[in-house]
């Protein structure tokens, strides 16, 4: 699919959509009253802004394309990444958010700095920056660049630059509030487009019953046998929690909207709303891939499942809208990541280490410079990723997360739940533990790829094993460390009893999720 396949109406919709986005960005920037809104939106975000922002950051074009591909090849089992997540979003709401908001922090490295000291904060700040550059910016730009390259037939570096310029505009012009407001607009369109695609596909295939008969029975099973090569149940049960804790509870890009919550209740309800939105991931993003298998079983490249459905089922004009929405979702992810990158570097490195008396104007200017520098570095990494051949997009994404997650998950969990954890243990986990985890990941993905060396366990089991090793190391070091210090952040003082409405909302979500898992049991 190239640009010459787009009708005049498609082009009109694309242009109109981006004009609307620019208007929203300008409006949000004019509403900004002080520089701090660049980072935490003046701590004024409501629950719906938080929910849409977290979901929008999570669901980019890369995940749309990859999820449809996973649905085409394995069914809804990949939906565990969406539905199992509610457990860890709940953990964010009731365990992490009260401490984050009570401490009035700007970044997560700042929180760990109060727990373990300045050395840990410095290490974690650099760790977070590297994580954002690789897992959020480069991988997202790579997947989005594939889409743009297919449509406009331009090189990857040009695709990445175009998308970065648009994303950087919202990050620098309106700060997090611009991203939050555009997320609401984008996600409503995303729901509409994806729901329309699913309904149109179900209509053409002959309904739900016809679809169920057209694909293998195990396509409706959330848990597969442990000898399944793609998604065995044990790695999902043991390995995903490591990624879940890191991704939903400790990743700056995901947690940033919660840090900007008006109060704890808004933050907890925003996280709950994210959990409800995650239910939509399966019918909106995975189900189209299953429908594509029923309608076009001869499709050779599963990564083309989503756009195959779009080009075959949607009329002229709708194709342009789909491209606009996918690009908008990419802008949401990249914009949030650029904002998080700027926040961490500026507040945790520049102000803390180099310019503690910097003015607000200087802080904002530094944030803009960091945003541009991060954008350029991410383009270079994207080009490097583009040179890698033969790797499945969905598995690459989940594998990278699986190898990044163990050190961070261990440090945050032990830092909160075990007071005897020492600074030395945390620092060793973040340095040696990270090097060990990343080293195993490089061996698994590139040096001795699992597709050729079948002795490797599933990458999610590797994530679990790495977490166990790092955790054991932290326990051992903490017990042997004679320089044990008291926690500098009094956890009890930052706790607040959840509102009844929050408890009710989470109870209802839990009941629904249990029901979904009981229903999709493969029978």
Features from the language model and the residues they span:
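Membrane-embedded helix-loop-helix hairpins and adjacent transmembrane boundary segments
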Residues: 1-523
